[in-house]
C-alpha cells in the first residue's frame, strides 16, 4: 500500500 493510501478515504467518500 502506498503512503497516501487510506481505507477510510474510500468509505467516507461514498458517505459524502
Curated annotation (Swiss-Prot):
Q: Which family does it belong to?
A: Belongs to the bradykinin-related peptide family.
UniProt-listed GO biological process terms: defense response; vasodilation
**Localisation per UniProt entry:** Secreted
What would be one Gene Ontology cellular-component term for the protein?
A: extracellular region
- What is this protein's record name? Bradykinin RL-16-1
Predominantly, its location class is: secreted
Q: Which GO terms describe its molecular function?
A: toxin activity
Job description of the protein = Induces relaxation of arterial smooth muscle, by targeting bradykinin receptors (BDKRB).
Keywords for this entry? Amphibian defense peptide, G-protein coupled receptor impairing toxin, Secreted, Toxin, Vasoactive, Vasodilator
Highest taxon above the source species: Eukaryota
Tissue localization of expression is: Expressed by the skin glands.
Amino acid at each position: 500500500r502506498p503512503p497516501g493510501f487510506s481505507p477510510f478515504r474510500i468509505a467516507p467518500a461514498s458517505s459524502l
